[in-house]
């Protein structure tokens, strides 16, 4: 049985972890969302989230976006390549409903999987 938990090891926690991804990222994005990824040597994917107050004013909207993003990652973690991902939220994402945001994330995860196989 495959574990679908989201332990601490699957998160980017320090600024050094984020900077590692920002140095040489593979990008997949839409006007509302960008996912940066960089291969790691750990053998499993990790995720970090950046949801700026500048782009999403209300805390409950920021929390909703982070919750849906973490859930999407948690469900796909075993099909994703061993990469560190940083999800960057841009203006306009709060207008998306939950279904549209989830579908957008799925599309971006698939794009990263294709890019990882190609490289």
UniProtKB/Swiss-Prot annotation:
One Pfam assignment: Ribonuclease_P
EC main group: hydrolase
Molecular function terms, GO-annotated: 3'-tRNA processing endoribonuclease activity; ribonuclease P activity; tRNA binding
EC number from the UniProt entry: 3.1.26.5
GO cellular component assignments: ribonuclease P complex
Entry superkingdom: Bacteria
InterPro entries: Ribosomal_Su5_D2-typ_SF, Ribsml_uS5_D2-typ_fold_subgr, RNase_P, RNase_P_CS
UniProt record, GO biological process: tRNA 5'-leader removal
Record key words, sorted: Endonuclease, Hydrolase, Nuclease, RNA-binding, tRNA processing
Known catalytic reactions: Endonucleolytic cleavage of RNA, removing 5'-extranucleotides from tRNA precursor
Segment forming the signal sequence: none
Protein family membership: Belongs to the RnpA family.
Subunit architecture: Consists of a catalytic RNA component (M1 or rnpB) and a protein subunit.
PANTHER family named in the record: RIBONUCLEASE P PROTEIN COMPONENT
HAMAP family in UniProt: RNase_P
Function: RNaseP catalyzes the removal of the 5'-leader sequence from pre-tRNA to produce the mature 5'-terminus. It can also cleave other RNA substrates such as 4.5S RNA. The protein component plays an auxiliary but essential role in vivo by binding to the 5'-leader sequence and broadening the substrate specificity of the ribozyme.
Designated name of the protein: Ribonuclease P protein component
Species whose genome carries this gene: Edwardsiella ictaluri (strain 93-146)
Species lineage: Bacteria, Pseudomonadati, Pseudomonadota, Gammaproteobacteria, Enterobacterales
């Amino acid at each position: 049985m495959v574990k679908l938990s989201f332990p601490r090891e699957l998160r980017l926690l320090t600024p050094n972890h984020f900077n590692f991804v920002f140095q040489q990222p593979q990008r997949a994005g839409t006007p509302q969302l960008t996912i940066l990824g960089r291969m790691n040597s750990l053998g499993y994917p990790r995720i970090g989230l950046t949801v700026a107050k500048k782009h999403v004013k209300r805390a409950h909207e920021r929390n909703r976006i982070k919750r849906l993003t973490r859930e999407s990652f948690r469900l796909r973690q075993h099909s994703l390549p061993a990469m560190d991902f940083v999800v960057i939220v841009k203006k306009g994402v709060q207008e998306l409903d939950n279904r549209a945001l989830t579908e957008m994330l799925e599309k971006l995860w698939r794009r990263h999987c294709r890019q990882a196989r190609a490289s």
